[in-house]
Amino acid sequence: MPGGHHLYLVPGFFGFTNLGALRYFAHVLDFLRARSRALGVRAEIHMVRTHPTASLPQRAARVLETVAETMGREGAVHVIGHSSGGLDARLAVASGVSLPSDANVERVARRVRTVITVATPHHGTPLASFFASLLGQRLLRFLSLWTVYVLRFGRLPISVVAKLGGLFARLDDHVGLNIALLDQLFGQLLADFSPTRRGAVETFFAEVSRDQALLPQLTPEGMEVFNATTRDRPGVRYGSVVTRARPPGVRSTLAAGLDPSAQATHALYQALYRLASRTPRGRVPALPPAQARRLRRAYGNLPGPGANDGIVPTRSQPWGEVIHAAQADHLDVIGHLHDPPRHTDWLTTGSGFDAEHFEALWADVAGYVFRRRRRP
């Protein structure tokens, strides 16, 4: 591919790239292909299959191996990671890195021109500490199946919604989290899949249960160690997409309407938002002036310590140049948003992020990669 480009899309924590038709980057892939054609750019886009919850070095090794196996002899390489996939991208091309792989780091790194991170917890997320607990792990298993179910069928069954009730009301205090009910609902959701799909989902969760090294590494304390030992590679451009969701409250609850499914997913969002907002003030990263200006321009003010996208604190996300700052939740930005007819929302957050915002975001990413920036 003389003068062309290889783009690698790296999924985040619990990325379900190996569940057949459930494509993690489905809408991103379609948009980037169309955008590259519109710009007259030759680009090949690759999906990276990482272990959903393995350690960062293990996941980064898989990124490295995928690039080495598919980049051919020519063409610039660009690595784009969503959520913890952005950390995989950084680590895979870091200066002086040693990874559990036989792939030649320097051979790959010489071709890398760009690393872009999207809603990535560069300074950790308090949610990782919660999900690393025994209760948190059981809830995470249920929430992951919830996500897969909603993306597959469009909404939760009313029988499940009815049982959720106040399950998430005091989630942040570990009070009222009924483990038996979670397991029952997990089984009920799983039973709705076809036998073939159910087998794929069960294999996925069995793989997850064998290796959950990633969670402790995504805590604010874990990322402090990561950043101290992971150096950006000279000559590589680093850009980031930053997200901030609407803080939940009375207005957002009313906006969710009377639909039981929307109210249930909004209750979950409220609980996740509260947990993700608990970054200790001493661990809120100071932003370089250019990053701070970009966030103020996008949001009207500099997001505080509690601002987040339902999973990752907003102030944890900038790394390098801020390419785009969106009012969106954590999965909105990869196309799982509330917008008919082709998109399915993950949670009812009231972010207002729609197909137009999605296309503007990824047009900015494509512009950064191909050096064809949009006018503000």
Predicted regions and their residues:
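Lipid deacylating catalytic domains
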Residues: M1-P376
